[in-house]
């Protein structure tokens, strides 16, 4: 069974008032994400991995030098689908309930979390991702290079930000810190993060 690209969870122009152009999604979703899906299907066709879940393909191919292409494409399919759900028109603000309490417990305050997350995203050299994860019941900020994600480290992803240049260049050019601030202030879908925590 072929892997498929889920639809965006919002119209491609929905985030324009919040700093992300429809053109960004034409390229980022329409070309980059779509290409990862196409490449993954070509790489696993006729192999036992074809029938696995995307998560299992990621876990089984990680660290296997003969399956680098499979891992990179599978992880990027998963990462992007997860990232789109982390975005919401008019998002940002503050989380509530258990999520807010866990963030306060782990980081001291929402502002301290934002500072740590922003630092992770800004200092990821080259391409990669910044994450908020549940690591055995404790919330942590982490960052991963290229396609890597927390699933391969036994962590539960709660929130991510794509810091590959193609994620922000049309909107923010080389100003990655401005992209990060805009994400935290205007786009974070805290409802999705809370669902991930509760799952």
From Swiss-Prot:
<dbReference type="GO" id="GO:0005737">
    <property type="term" value="C:cytoplasm"/>
</dbReference>
<dbReference type="InterPro" id="IPR036324">
    <property type="entry name" value="Mn/Fe_SOD_N_sf"/>
</dbReference>
<keyword id="KW-0408">Iron</keyword>
<dbReference type="InterPro" id="IPR019831">
    <property type="entry name" value="Mn/Fe_SOD_N"/>
</dbReference>
<feature type="binding site">
    <location>
        <position position="28"/>
    </location>
    <ligand>
        <name>Fe cation</name>
    </ligand>
</feature>
<dbReference type="InterPro" id="IPR001189">
    <property type="entry name" value="Mn/Fe_SOD"/>
</dbReference>
<dbReference type="Pfam" id="PF00081">
    <property type="entry name" value="Sod_Fe_N"/>
</dbReference>
<protein>
    <recommendedName>
        <fullName>Superoxide dismutase [Fe]</fullName>
        <ecNumber>1.15.1.1</ecNumber>
    </recommendedName>
</protein>
<comment type="subunit">
    <text>Homodimer.</text>
</comment>
<keyword id="KW-0963">Cytoplasm</keyword>
<feature type="binding site">
    <location>
        <position position="80"/>
    </location>
    <ligand>
        <name>Fe cation</name>
    </ligand>
</feature>
<feature type="binding site">
    <location>
        <position position="166"/>
    </location>
    <ligand>
        <name>Fe cation</name>
    </ligand>
</feature>
<dbReference type="InterPro" id="IPR036314">
    <property type="entry name" value="SOD_C_sf"/>
</dbReference>
<keyword id="KW-0479">Metal-binding</keyword>
<dbReference type="GO" id="GO:0046872">
    <property type="term" value="F:metal ion binding"/>
</dbReference>
<comment type="function">
    <text>Destroys superoxide anion radicals which are normally produced within the cells and which are toxic to biological systems.</text>
</comment>
<comment type="similarity">
    <text>Belongs to the iron/manganese superoxide dismutase family.</text>
</comment>
<dbReference type="Pfam" id="PF02777">
    <property type="entry name" value="Sod_Fe_C"/>
</dbReference>
<keyword id="KW-0560">Oxidoreductase</keyword>
<feature type="binding site">
    <location>
        <position position="162"/>
    </location>
    <ligand>
        <name>Fe cation</name>
    </ligand>
</feature>
<dbReference type="GO" id="GO:0004784">
    <property type="term" value="F:superoxide dismutase activity"/>
</dbReference>
<dbReference type="InterPro" id="IPR019832">
    <property type="entry name" value="Mn/Fe_SOD_C"/>
</dbReference>
<dbReference type="InterPro" id="IPR019833">
    <property type="entry name" value="Mn/Fe_SOD_BS"/>
</dbReference>
